[in-house]
Amino acid sequence: MANTTSAKKATRKIARRSAVNKARRSRIRSFVRKVEEAIASGDQALAAAALKAAQPELMRAATKGVMHSNTASRKVSRLAQRVKSLSA
């Protein structure tokens, strides 16, 4: 248990940031799931549209520190590769 005032404040602050980060991570998963569902259905146009919506969300998460920038880039790259393979 935190004893000092600053430690108590830090605990409150961490709880708030954790809630924000959890919400953002959940939102990212939803966007990625939509892309993966579109890929599974084989609809190239729908998958491309879903990817276009998911990409800024992933990069925003990297900017906000929810995930590492390399992780976000890797996820975007792999999704784009799978969407592109639908047209071939």
From Swiss-Prot:
Gene Ontology CC entries for this record: cytosol; small ribosomal subunit
Region (Disordered): 1-23, 65-88
GO molecular function: small ribosomal subunit rRNA binding; structural constituent of ribosome
Protein keywords: Ribonucleoprotein, Ribosomal protein, RNA-binding, rRNA-binding
Entry-linked InterPro entries: Ribosomal_bS20, Ribosomal_bS20_sf
SUPFAM superfamilies: Ribosomal protein S20 (SSF46992)
BP terms from Gene Ontology: translation
Pfam families referenced in this protein's UniProt entry, alphabetically: Ribosomal_S20p (PF01649)
Function: Binds directly to 16S ribosomal RNA.
NCBIfam families named among the record's database cross-references: S20
Annotated family: Belongs to the bacterial ribosomal protein bS20 family.
PANTHER family on file: 30S RIBOSOMAL PROTEIN S20 (PTHR33398), SMALL RIBOSOMAL SUBUNIT PROTEIN BS20C (PTHR33398:SF1)
Entry-linked HAMAP family: Ribosomal_bS20
Protein name: Small ribosomal subunit protein bS20
Protein source organism: Rhizobium meliloti (strain 1021)
Gene name of this polypeptide: rpsT
